[in-house]
A protein has these predicted regions:
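Substrate-binding/catalytic cleft of secreted carbohydrate-active enzymes
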Residues: 171-173, 289-292, 299-541, 545-564, ...
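Secreted/periplasmic carbohydrate-active enzymes, especially glycoside hydrolases
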Residues: 1-304, 314, 318-322, 343-346, ...
Length: 640
């Protein structure tokens, strides 16, 4: 039976200028210089070495695989001086059978390269391309007769449920490395009860009255257990959870899950943290998911690359509908076509069984560069056809650059389309969002459209009583999102909307808002310690958990004699108190405003049913100068 042995500790890292240090995995060499601005983080080749004793296994009956869950971006793997593998693509799993080269004591060498080149994506984008072995490395010890481990990082099982009314047919294909194997497949419910069973590498199993995976409302998961035997002896076993669900998109009504109208409203997410880069832990993943769920989102765009399998599992468990994509981004490279194909094949094969995933994203803002347009369009057709061939059960989509017009041919290749639009941030005019959506829907009424990105920078240390576009204040970010969430309510035909971004993230080329190296469009800060006011706006609209939030608590010094107090809540009635006295009680929806005559010190409390929030404001002669963006700091501009 298979066994797993982690290889996470005591690696020798040889960095730039032959600098050496002992590190544990996960690790990136850009955790600091990839987040501090200047667009000067090290992109090049580094080396990792590890010595290890031969793992315990029976060489007559077992094999040993070396598995990498993520090495960015290109890697060469050598064991005991023998070059065993080269892998291009920094976000997917790959494995190597190392059985034949193992000795009693072994040396593993991994050369990792994130340097600029013209063939491996991504190369140009508004985020840091951290180099390193930033996900788990481990041994898989398996019987010589086992489920396949050699095909594009697959786990050897492919599960395709088809549901009609009160029954589901679950097509399960297993792939083995021997023709002598007998395979038994069981489907178990969440209580561990076997609800269907069959024998063979290609079976159709029937489930009567299946419980459907229904997003946040009921993310019910079944488990497929495949057992491989040879001459009656169990040699290998794999388990894989899956969900039974249907979905569709109506260009006039939006997204449907299991026949029920299910508007998709959510966030995008990058996989990095302050001071860690992309070398993050399961605890970090859990923290991210908990906050996204608290927000009330029901969908996540996992941008702009394949994320950790652990996070896709969390999406399955928590009921998040997922847009999954490859990093074919910003600029088409004629020499990179094969890499887009290989990354898409790996994405689909490694993630096919996740019920959370409903769309494959083929590219992001690819028309930023206008070079090689014909080859770029052809590459999109190739990827779109590949997705449909490998997975006819899901739809395809792409994210269009803001300057990509509605008539651009690239916007009409995939099944669905999303636009990355920052109208009201990079360009003035909130109303342009309504204008664009109405025009597109008028001209292309049968083309499903969503917003794949929208957002505004917001710094929790910058504030203004009169927020303006480009000032990076927490107040303007909230003002922007207040408009956008109402805009989307006016256009119910949209198939999805994604805030850019759930969390601030590193973009080393940026220098804006007084903190270089960062994109501050997150609803939560990079260290995950501060939820900006905009976070609570979406929570007020999307979450059913009772809460109330007083906005502007970080603008605690105010010079105006009468100040506006804004409250976000999902409760229908709010009472505002100052220094223990009731100021006013209001009924409304989501956003409440009160006019408060300022005293010298103001202990303010908002009460909504059983929940409350409090803050303290001080009446000052002048506005606090620390709230304003310093003159030497750059204001908002697009990264392109």
């Amino acid at each position: 039976m298979r066994r797993i042995q982690n290889l996470m500790e005591q690696w020798l890292f040889i960095g730039p200028d032959n600098r050496q240090e002992q590190v544990n995995l996960p690790h990136t060499w850009n955790a600091k210089d990839g987040q501090d601005g200047g667009n000067d983080y090290y992109r090049g080749t580094c080396h990792y070495e590890k010595t290890f004793e031969k793992p315990e296994f029976d060489p007559e009956a077992e094999e040993v695989y070396l598995e990498f869950l993520g090495v960015n971006a290109s890697s060469d793997v050598t064991v005991n001086g023998k070059e065993l593998a080269h892998h291009d693509g920094g976000y997917s799993t790959f494995r190597i059978n190392i059985t034949e080269v193992l000795e009693d004591r072994n040396k593993l060498e991994v050369t990792v390269d994130n340097s600029v080149n013209g063939k491996v994506y991504p190369q140009k984008a508004d985020f840091t391309f951290y180099g390193g072995i930033y996900r788990d490395v481990r041994f898989l010890i398996v019987s010589k007769e086992h489920f396949d481990l050699d095909y594009l990082g697959s786990n050897g099982i492919k599960i395709t449920p088809e549901v009609k009314e009160n029954e589901a047919n679950v097509h399960i294909e297993t792939f083995t490395n021997t023709e002598e194997a007998q395979v038994n497949v069981q489907i178990k419910d969440q209580d561990g009860k076997v609800v269907a069973e069959g024998n063979g590498c290609d079976v159709n199993l029937n489930i009567q009255n299946p419980i459907r995976w229904h997003g946040r409302k009921n993310p019910y998961l079944y488990t497929a257990v495949a057992t491989l035997t040879v001459n009656g002896e169990v040699k290998d076993e794999i388990t894989n959870r899956f969900g039974i669900r249907t979905f569709s998109v109506d260009p006039k009504k939006g997204f449907f899950l299991n026949g029920e109208h299910y508007p998709l409203h959510g966030v995008s997410r990058h996989q990095d943290f302050k001071a860690l880069g992309n070398a993050i832990s399961t605890k970090n993943h859990d923290e991210d998911m908990d906050m996204i769920c608290e927000l009330g989102a029901n969908t996540i765009r996992l941008a702009h690359y394949q994320h950790n399998q652990y996070f896709y599992d969390l999406c399955d468990e928590r009921g998040m509908v997922v847009w999954a994509e490859i990093p074919y981004i910003s600029e088409h490279m004629p020499g990179g076509r094969e890499n887009t194909i290989s990354q898409m094949r790996e994405l689909i094969v490694q993630n096919y069984n996740h019920p959370s995933i409903v769309v494959w994203g083929v590219s992001n803002e690819i028309t930023i560069s206008t070079k090689d347009k014909k080859d770029m369009l052809d590459n999109h057709h190739v990827l779109n056809d590949l997705c449909h061939k490998m997975d006819p059960t899901r739809l395809t989509t792409l994210a269009c650059y803001a300057m990509c017009g509605p008539f651009n041919r690239s916007a009409h290749i995939t099944d669905l389309v999303g636009w990355n639009l920052y109208l009201g941030w990079y360009v003035p005019g909130f109303f342009l969002n309504d204008l664009f959506l109405r025009f597109f829907h008028l001209v292309f009424p049968n083309r499903p459209i969503g917003y794949s990105e929208y957002g505004a920078e917001g710094m929790p240390n910058l504030h203004s009583r009169r927020p303006r576009r480009g000032d990076h204040t927490e107040e303007y970010q909230a003002k922007y999102h207040e408009y956008m969430i109402k805009c989307f309510e006016r256009h119910p035909f949209m198939w999805s909307t994604y805030v850019w971004n759930m969390f601030d993230f590193a973009a080393d080329a940026r220098n804006q808002g007084g903190e270089p190296g960062m994109n501050h469009k997150g609803l939560v800060t990079f260290d995950r310690k501060t939820k900006k006011d905009s976070f609570f706006l979406y929570k007020a609209y999307w979450s059913e958990e009772p809460f109330v939030h007083l906005c502007g608590s970080r603008r605690s010094d105010r010079s105006e004699d009468t100040t506006t107090i804004k409250v976000y809540t999902n409760q229908p009635v709010v009472s505002l108190y100052n220094n223990g006295e009731l100021i006013e009680q209001k009924s409304g929806n989501h956003i409440f405003t009160f006019q408060l005559p300022m005293e010298k010190e103001n202990k303010i409390e908002a009460v909504a049913g059983s929940v409350k929030d409090a803050m303290v404001l001080h009446h000052t002669e002048k506005e606090n100068p620390d709230y304003k963006l310093k003159k030497e700091a750059k204001k908002s501009e697009n990264w392109v």
